[in-house]
């Protein structure tokens, strides 16, 4: 391989891409990785080992510390034809070299891989500030300054757009361990894109860390891009996750795609940028089946992405965390983020986030249908707003260490949780607000399902990763037990119980109060010009039903034997509306089967 050949490859990729997609802008980027994973690097490990941090791989290789300085050498570089002067900051050298390299070879952007610019030990929870036992806040200011200076020095020399990989951890863990000032980096107009979700779910089954970490990094954004990355193949490490990590199951599509953020204006946003790692496998093959099989799920996940705040919203203090010098807060954010990670792994369906700064700008109407989750607020205004929302009937959960919780007096509609309690404490606390999620596991050591719930078009969409398919999951929500479309639910003491496959994605528009029996919910052919959907619900035994139509559409209930017949409208159902749950039909003492009909036309007068 030569630079001339590489430049030709870049040019060919753009030309062929333009032929295939005439209306698209074809960009080709280059990667820089901090370790030895992707390429042999004489520069890192022979000429300039002084830039390698403390973390080692197999006691031989380490990761580049972006805050390091270079010793002098006499090699010829594009940006330094006479060699590198002693004491040159790595950020300056890297920026100048990148500008020359990307320009000369025709690249359009640079991808900073595996945590470069954030940490020199991106997979660890220890670092320059936290050694695993003690925090060293006296090192914080220098660590923050050095990291931020890398970005400023690099950007001074390199004009190309940057995309980032980030670490596998969260904003709070990265700050507590290494002093990563992510809020300052985002706010500095550096022309970077926020890191995408990590591949930790695929690599070690830790969906909680993937989901939690991603939410902390996208509660604020440096630009308009909200990325989602799917781990399809790996061109370096021999695995193709669609088959050998996901078992052909789309769980790592639907769960991260269920994540949403609420921006400063109170609007719900979902991923708008798709990254695929990668289209080719380690042998250079591009098998069609690895595109054709997950593609429908990617499209469906986009179709079902949230358009309103989820039932549970996390208020995350990115700015407060990453500008703090308080040793006790370092411990707080570290323990708190781990607690949320563990709670998600325990089945808490948390998939919506906003920053505390954005939260203060929002009207109460944004959160009418949600339960709010927050660490003990550092900003008194956040605590006062939480109290105000609680006084209006909105549930609030505040978590922290015992010491921090002492500063928060108890108030109505609020649960306080100690982060050093068992991980199931958060899931169990949801019952105080009418949400019961329980598991029947064949062995105590079995990992519970990971669940995401998104709200779209007046429905809830459940996304599930079930680590063990012998586990039963039972739900009971404030409006009744959720009945998922395309499923049968065994009713146990008023809860709907399911035995999920490895990965599930289900729509929910039906909630039921019924003690026992088996309730089935299946889509039926509407066979009707007036109604575009007919959902058959059977197995009803003196049940109370609450049915949520698509936003703004006419809805009715028919008791006809089949949809081929003219609908027989059921007058026992009444249209209702309340601020906490929206618009729905309610019927009581219903037995047998019904058809839930959803209209074809939008009703301008319908209550949303």
Predicted segments, located by residue:
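Glycan-processing catalytic domains of CAZymes
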Residues: 1-371, 375, 379-391, 398-431, ...
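Short, aromatic- and glycine-rich surface loops/edge beta-strands on solvent-exposed regions
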Residues: 592-608
């Amino acid at each position: 391989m030569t630079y001339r050949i590489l430049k030709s490859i870049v040019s060919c990729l753009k030309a062929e891409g333009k032929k295939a997609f005439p209306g698209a802008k074809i960009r080709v980027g280059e990667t820089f990785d901090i370790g030895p994973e992707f390429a042999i690097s004489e520069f890192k490990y022979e000429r300039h080992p002084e830039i390698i941090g403390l973390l080692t791989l197999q006691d031989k290789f380490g990761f580049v510390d972006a805050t390091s300085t270079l010793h002098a050498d006499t090699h010829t570089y594009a940006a330094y034809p006479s060699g590198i002067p002693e004491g040159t900051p790595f950020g300056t050298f890297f920026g100048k070299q990148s500008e020359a390299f990307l320009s000369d070879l025709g690249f359009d952007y640079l991808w900073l891989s595996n945590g470069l610019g954030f940490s020199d030990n991106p997979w660890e929870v220890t670092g320059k500030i936290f050694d695993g036992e003690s925090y060293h806040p006296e090192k914080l200011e220098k660590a923050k300054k050095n990291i931020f200076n890398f970005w400023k020095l690099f950007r001074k020399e390199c004009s190309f757009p940057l995309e980032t990989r980030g670490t596998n951890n969260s904003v709070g863990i990265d700050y507590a361990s290494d002093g990563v000032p992510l809020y300052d980096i985002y706010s500095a107009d550096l022309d970077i894109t926020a890191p995408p979700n990590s591949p930790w779910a695929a690599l070690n089954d830790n969906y909680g860390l993937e989901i939690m970490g991603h939410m902390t990094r996208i509660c604020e954004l440096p630009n308009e891009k909200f990325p989602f990355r799917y781990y399809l193949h790996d061109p370096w490490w021999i695995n193709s996750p669609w088959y050998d990590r996901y078992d052909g199951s789309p769980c790592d599509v639907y769960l991260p795609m269920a994540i949403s953020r609420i921006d400063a204006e109170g609007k719900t946003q979902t991923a708008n940028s798709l990254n695929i790692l990668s289209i080719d496998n380690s042998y250079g093959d591009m098998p069609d089946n690895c595109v054709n099989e997950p593609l429908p799920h990617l499209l469906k996940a986009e179709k079902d992405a949230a358009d309103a705040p989820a039932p549970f919203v996390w208020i995350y203090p990115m700015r407060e965390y990453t500008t703090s010098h308080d040793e006790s807060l370092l411990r707080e954010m570290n323990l708190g983020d781990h607690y949320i990670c563990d709670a998600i792994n325990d089945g808490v369906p948390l998939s919506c986030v906003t920053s505390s700064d954005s939260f203060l700008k929002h009207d109460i109407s944004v959160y009418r249908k949600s339960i709010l989750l927050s660490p003990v607020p550092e900003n008194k205004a956040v605590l006062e707003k939480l109290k105000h929302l609680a006084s209006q009937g909105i549930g609030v959960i505040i978590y922290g260490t015992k010491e921090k919780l002492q500063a928060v007096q108890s108030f109505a509609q609020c649960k306080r949780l100690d982060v050093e309690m068992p991980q199931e404490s958060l899931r169990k606390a949801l019952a105080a607000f009418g949400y019961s999620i329980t598991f029947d596991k064949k062995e105590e050591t079995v990992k519970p399902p990971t669940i995401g719930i998104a709200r779209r078009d007046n429905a809830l969409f459940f996304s599930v990763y079930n680590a063990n398919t012998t586990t039963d999951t039972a739900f009971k929500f404030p409006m009744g037990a959720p009945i998922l479309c395309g499923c049968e639910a065994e009713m146990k003491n008023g809860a709907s119980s399911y035995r999920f496959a490895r990965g599930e994605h289900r729509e929910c528009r039906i909630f039921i109060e019924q003690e026992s029996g088996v309730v089935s919910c299946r889509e039926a052919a509407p066979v009707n010009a007036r109604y575009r959907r007919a959902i058959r619900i059977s197995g009803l035994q003196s049940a109370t039903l609450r049915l949520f139509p698509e936003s703004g559409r006419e809805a009715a209930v028919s008791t006809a034997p089949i949809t081929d017949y003219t609908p027989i409208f059921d007058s026992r159902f009444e249209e209702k509306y309340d601020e906490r749950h929206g618009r729905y039909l309610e019927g009581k003492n219903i037995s047998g089967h019904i058809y839930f009909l959803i209209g074809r036309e939008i009703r301008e007068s319908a209550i949303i």
